[in-house]
């Protein structure tokens, strides 16, 4: 039995879902993979700090999936604007939604409206074409709220000079902007207590 499936979102989840579908042995499944950006890979392309080339190496394995003949990548298409979910349901036997986390959460504290979300800043330094390039980086002290991987990446990028970032995969236009970075102190604020792990004796 031959089936046509639409997968919305060409990040890692969408690509791996597509791979599982086209490798199905019970059905002959062909996948159209819709992506709103011009290029695939989602946060692997636009959410990893430029000084993490090993993580970006995952792109190579994702490329092998995209090269399979039963999969067609359709970029620059925003589902909900260019084509509706209802239209996809009419055209395909199934629709898989794998759009991921697309927005920063609002910081609901006094002065929160002056904050910049992690996704917005990461999109900037990774060269995502949908994000602003002309950042004001004149602050000498910066606070990063959070101590997770993304917060560490942002803090590390802000703590480096433009020249230190030049040896990474940073896009040229982002490098030019980050050369103006005046931050000399980056404070990381945690909402949880951080302590040494308890060791059993």
Predicted regions and their residues:
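Beta1/beta-strand and adjacent pyrophosphate-binding region of the FAD-binding site
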Residues: 2-11, 139-145
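N-terminal Rossmann-like dinucleotide/flavin-binding domain of flavoprotein oxidoreductases
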Residues: 30, 38-94
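Conserved Rossmann-like nucleotide-cofactor binding loop
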Residues: 13, 39, 102, 150
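N-terminal Rossmann-like FAD-binding beta1-loop-alpha1 element of flavoenzymes
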Residues: 5-26, 154-158
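Glycine-/small-residue-rich beta->alpha transition segments that form the dinucleotide
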Residues: 94, 98-105
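Short beta-strand "acidic-cap" motif of Rossmann-like dinucleotide-binding folds
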Residues: 28-35, 166-172, 183-189
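Single conserved hydrophobic/aromatic residue that forms the stacking wall/gate
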Residues: 192-201
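Glycine-rich dinucleotide-binding loop and its adjacent helix/turn
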Residues: 104-180
């Amino acid at each position: 039995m031959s089936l046509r499936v639409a997968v919305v979102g060409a990040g890692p989840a969408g690509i791996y879902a597509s791979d599982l579908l086209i490798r199905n042995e019970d059905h002959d499944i062909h996948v159209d993979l819709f992506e709103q950006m011009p290029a695939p890979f989602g946060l692997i392309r636009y959410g990893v700090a430029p000084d993490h080339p090993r993580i970006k190496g995952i792109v190579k394995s994702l490329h092998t999936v995209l090269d399979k003949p039963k999969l067609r990548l359709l970029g620059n298409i925003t589902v909900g604007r260019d084509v509706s979910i209802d239209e996809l349901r009419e055209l395909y036997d199934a629709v898989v939604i794998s759009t991921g986390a697309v927005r920063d959460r609002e910081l609901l504290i006094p002065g929160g409206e002056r904050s910049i979300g992690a996704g917005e800043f990461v999109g900037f330094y990774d060269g995502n074409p949908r994000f602003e390039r002309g950042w004001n980086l004149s602050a000498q002290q910066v606070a990063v709220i959070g101590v997770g991987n993304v917060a560490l990446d942002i803090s590390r990028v802000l703590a480096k000079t433009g020249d230190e970032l030049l040896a990474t995969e940073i896009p040229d236009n982002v490098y030019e902007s980050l050369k103006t970075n005046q931050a000399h102190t980056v404070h990381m604020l945690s909402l949880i207590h951080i302590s040494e792990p308890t060791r059993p004796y």
